[in-house]
């Protein structure tokens, strides 16, 4: 269920803006999206796991805030990120 360190490093390498980047909004949003997707799969099989559901809602809210920040600060980076992640339809 949890995101492994290897998978997290792959995501960071894919979305980073420079060599030592681990905290840019793009990286944070990509890692949160991966965590949200894995937790979503978990909740499909364990429908009554309300503690995990609350964690999922907190992650979705944090990702929404980061996306709003990125949209307000740099719209081109925001558009590139949502197309890469496939967030908006």
From Swiss-Prot:
GO terms for molecular function: rRNA binding; structural constituent of ribosome. The keyword Ribonucleoprotein applies. Disulfide bonds: none annotated. Pfam families: Ribosomal_S15. One of its GO terms (cellular component) is cytosolic small ribosomal subunit. Keywords: Ribonucleoprotein, Ribosomal protein, RNA-binding, rRNA-binding. GO terms for biological process: translation. InterPro entries: Ribosomal_uS15, Ribosomal_uS15_bac-type, uS15_NS1_RNA-bd_sf. Belongs to the universal ribosomal protein uS15 family. Part of the 30S ribosomal subunit. Forms a bridge to the 50S subunit in the 70S ribosome, contacting the 23S rRNA. One of the primary rRNA binding proteins, it binds directly to 16S rRNA where it helps nucleate assembly of the platform of the 30S subunit by binding and bridging several RNA helices of the 16S rRNA. This is Small ribosomal subunit protein uS15.
